[in-house]
């Protein structure tokens, strides 16, 4: 599946195929899960998905940056950024390896 971008529609179709919900129910389920993740992140909570990874909101302080074209210094305001940290299980699965004696293919 290298090179392909997975969309919400693809996720909904996978739920439809594997779980047996209707297409409308599958789409609603995907939207609900993604919406809840967004709500948690926007309120500053960390989202941890076992065997997948963690989404964390981090604060970045004010700093001085440079316009790469002109070299002029610009003040960059403080902001929140979202960071994804993959689990060791996901890293191993991507790299085709093993983690803690488990095959990367095994579902937990």
From Swiss-Prot:
Coiled-coil region list: none
Signal peptide as annotated in the record: none
Listed InterPro entries: Hist_DNA-bd, Histone-like_DNA-bd_CS, IHF-like_DNA-bd_dom_sf, IHF_alpha
This protein's UniProt keywords: DNA recombination, DNA-binding, Transcription, Transcription regulation, Translation regulation
Alphabetized SMART domains for the sequence: BHL
A GO BP entry: regulation of DNA-templated transcription
Keyword Transcription: yes
Any GO molecular function: structural constituent of chromatin
Domain of life (superkingdom): Bacteria
GO cellular component: cytosol
Stated family: Belongs to the bacterial histone-like protein family.
Role played: This protein is one of the two subunits of integration host factor, a specific DNA-binding protein that functions in genetic recombination as well as in transcriptional and translational control.
Complex and partners: Heterodimer of an alpha and a beta chain.
NCBIfam families (alphabetical): PRK00285.1 (NF001401)
Protein name: Integration host factor subunit alpha
């Amino acid at each position: 599946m290298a090179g392909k971008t997975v969309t919400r529609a693809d996720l909904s179709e996978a739920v439809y195929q594997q779980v047996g919900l209707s297409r409308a129910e599958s789409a609603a389920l995907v939207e609900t899960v993604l919406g809840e993740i967004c709500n948690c992140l926007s309120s500053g909570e960390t989202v941890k998905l076992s065997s997948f990874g963690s989404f964390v909101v981090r604060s970045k302080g004010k700093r001085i940056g440079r316009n790469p074209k002109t070299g002029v210094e610009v003040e960059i305001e403080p902001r929140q950024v979202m960071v994804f940290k993959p689990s060791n299980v996901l890293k191993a699965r991507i790299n085709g390896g093993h983690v803690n004696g488990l095959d990367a293919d095994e579902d937990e």
